[in-house]
From Swiss-Prot:
Species, as recorded: Homo sapiens (Human)
Family: Belongs to the FRG2 family.
Region of interest: Disordered: 1-137, 251-278
Compartments it resides in: Nucleus
One GO location term (cellular component): nucleus
Superkingdom of origin organism: Eukaryota
InterPro entries for the chain: FRG2 (IPR026245)
Record protein name field: Protein FRG2-like-1
Keywords attached to this entry: Nucleus
Coiled-coil parts of chain: none
């Protein structure tokens, strides 16, 4: 009976020991003998094994809140990491963009500022140069107008000087004088031939040849004189353009007027026709 009464206490004590004390702790009673210690040890081991199995079953049947909490935290952490990865990547990209923009702005301020200043200065210069350029164009136009006005005034002065009589020799004057000089030279040659005939008379053949030459030569001289007079009278007449009368061979001006030269009649007829035309 003593053993039967002690069994429930031992069982309870073994359960308490299994729950309170760490495993593999032996229970011994010093009051009883060595023979009683062995069954108590075996019973304690069996009770401890039963209690550990029950504890394991309870742990398996009952959910562990710590594990669930740890799993939830892991899932949340995974979701947070999964959600934070794109956020972090976007944040990094934004940071990189900001850094790049700040670097670019620094470079622009450091290196490109002179270019901007140059462009601004060029724009300012172009804006300021447009009125300057316009003023320069106006000045050049004014200078051209002044030069033209001066040239016009110079030309008008020349025309006035010509009208007053102060005139330089022109091409027309040189042509007329040259033609008159040639005709006079030809006529003088003819006059010299007639003078020689007086001092040393020629033969009849020489006189006939001289008379043959004299007619066309006098005609040419008269045409030259007529051309000179036409050139003189088509344009405004001047004193130097009036043809002078040719002197006869061995005759004065009065004798020539009384006895005209044989070819002089032709000149008068030609000049009269020219005057009629004019």
């Amino acid at each position: 009976m003593g053993k039967g009464n002690e069994d429930p206490d031992l069982h309870c004590s073994s359960i308490q020991c299994s729950t309170d004390q760490p495993p593999f702790q032996q229970i011994s009673f010093t009051e009883k003998g060595s023979d009683e210690k062995k069954p108590f040890k075996e019973k304690g081991k069996t009770a401890f094994s039963h209690s550990s199995e029950k504890h394991i079953q309870r742990q398996g049947s009952e959910p562990n809140p710590n594990k669930e909490n740890s799993e939830e935290t892991k899932l949340k952490a995974g979701n947070s990491t999964a959600g934070s990865e794109p956020e972090s990547s976007s944040y990094r990209e934004n940071c990189r963009k900001r850094k790049m923009s700040s670097k670019d702005s620094c470079q622009d301020t450091a290196g490109n500022c002179p270019e901007k200043e140059c462009s601004l200065s060029l724009n300012k210069k172009s804006r300021s140069s447009t009125p300057v350029h316009n003023s320069e164009i106006q000045e050049t136009c004014d200078a051209h107008h002044r030069g033209r006005s001066r040239a016009c005034t110079g030309r008008s002065k020349r025309h006035r000087s010509r009208a007053l009589g102060v005139q330089t020799p022109s091409i027309r004057k040189s042509l007329v004088t040259s033609v008159r000089a040639m005709s006079e030279a030809v006529y003088q040659d003819l006059a010299q031939v007639w003078a020689q005939q007086i001092h040393s008379p020629l033969t009849c053949e020489q006189l006939t040849l001289l008379t043959r030459l004299r007619g066309p030569l006098c005609a040419q001289v008269q045409t030259l004189y007529s051309m000179a007079t036409q050139a003189a009278y088509v344009f405004p007449a001047e004193s130097w353009l009036v043809p002078a009368t040719l002197p006869g061979p061995g005759e004065s001006a009065l004798d020539r007027e009384a006895h005209p030269f044989p070819g002089q009649e032709i000149t008068e007829t030609v000049s009269g026709s020219d005057e009629a035309k004019l």
